[in-house]
């Protein structure tokens, strides 16, 4: 099973979300920053690496806050998606790979076209079932 990790990054009441690039897989769909765990990495180490690559930041990966499984028709294997609470310096966040990144209020997340694997988590955030008391980004 493929392990994929994603970070919930919050600053000043907003959540960082990322739009995939035009022309790539799942183009222009929204997601949380993160990616595939490689080799012998732990999920937390994989997320820290992905955040360096995608956002140019050193992250403090906190507690696991949500876990789900999903199978895309385009993929041969099921994936396990693990969300972590993450602390970064908000002012240091740079868009390194996405079409765009945005800081959004949880009440506006449902307006975005998220990847299917992220939608259950987005719903929980919108209903305030998680994330409200998680660590926030510095800055």
Indicate residue ranges for each PLM-predicted region.
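Conserved N-terminal beta-strand and adjoining loop/helix that marks the start
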Residues: 1-16, 36
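A structural microfeature
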Residues: 17, 63-66
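Active-site-adjacent beta-strand/loop module that shapes the phosphate/pyrophosphate-binding cleft
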Residues: 3, 58-59, 68-93, 102, ...
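Charged phosphate-binding loop/patch that engages nucleotide di/tri-phosphates or the phosphate backbone
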Residues: 117-139
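NUDIX/MutT-family hydrolases
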Residues: 85, 94-125
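Conserved hydrophobic "DFG−1" position in protein kinase catalytic cores
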Residues: 9-10, 17, 86-88, 103
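Conserved Nudix-box catalytic region and its N-terminal flanking loop in Nudix hydrolases
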Residues: 14-53, 57
